[in-house]
């Protein structure tokens, strides 16, 4: 199983959409607090529809608590400052894919602690600053899931 990590998410509908995505793919979701909204925010519930009960969500008090609880063996950070494209990574079961807050991305303290090959990016045309968080998560999730052969999915010939 793969893991999505949202570092201090700010916009409830994005997190709700990602909850729904995790329910549909079997990925686990980790949220590193503080969040920019309350967990019972109606916009979060609306975007996630009734998928909350089908998603494994773990909330962590802060980044240190996340590291202590999960001890990720392979942690990839999505950043516009990354070099390898998300599709150049050979994903493995158990990987963690971390995304920063919508308005500022991941802090330098986290990025600087990772090797260059674990700071990955989604290719974009020149002069594009960033993608919407839930869209970016979807792009990476489906590439990783595809590489692993869509475990748990119902595939039709």
Curated annotation (Swiss-Prot):
Gene name in the database record: trmL
Organism field: Escherichia coli (strain K12)
Name this polypeptide is given: tRNA (cytidine(34)-2'-O)-methyltransferase
Family membership: Belongs to the class IV-like SAM-binding methyltransferase superfamily. RNA methyltransferase TrmH family. TrmL subfamily.
Broad class of enzyme this protein falls into: transferase
Subcellular location per the Swiss-Prot or TrEMBL entry: Cytoplasm
Assembly and binders: Homodimer.
GO CC terms: cytoplasm
Catalytically driven reaction(s): cytidine(34) in tRNA + S-adenosyl-L-methionine = 2'-O-methylcytidine(34) in tRNA + S-adenosyl-L-homocysteine + H(+); 5-carboxymethylaminomethyluridine(34) in tRNA(Leu) + S-adenosyl-L-methionine = 5-carboxymethylaminomethyl-2'-O-methyluridine(34) in tRNA(Leu) + S-adenosyl-L-homocysteine + H(+)
UniProt KW keywords: Cytoplasm, Methyltransferase, S-adenosyl-L-methionine, Transferase, tRNA processing
Keyword Transferase: yes
Chain sites annotated for binding S-adenosyl-L-methionine: 78, 100, 122, 130
Disulfide bonds: none
SUPFAM superfamilies, sorted: alpha/beta knot
GO MF terms, alphabetically ordered: protein homodimerization activity; RNA binding; tRNA (5-carboxymethylaminomethyluridine(34)-2'-O)-methyltransferase activity; tRNA (cytidine(34)-2'-O)-methyltransferase activity
Record function comment: Methylates the ribose at the nucleotide 34 wobble position in the two leucyl isoacceptors tRNA(Leu)(CmAA) and tRNA(Leu)(cmnm5UmAA). Catalyzes the methyl transfer from S-adenosyl-L-methionine to the 2'-OH of the wobble nucleotide. Recognition of the target requires a pyridine at position 34 and N(6)-(isopentenyl)-2-methylthioadenosine at position 37.
GO BP, sorted A to Z: wobble position cytosine ribose methylation; wobble position uridine ribose methylation
Cited NCBIfam families: PRK10358.1 (NF007683), tRNA_yibK_trmL (TIGR00185)
HAMAP family membership: tRNA_methyltr_TrmL (MF_01885)
EC number, as in UniProt: 2.1.1.207
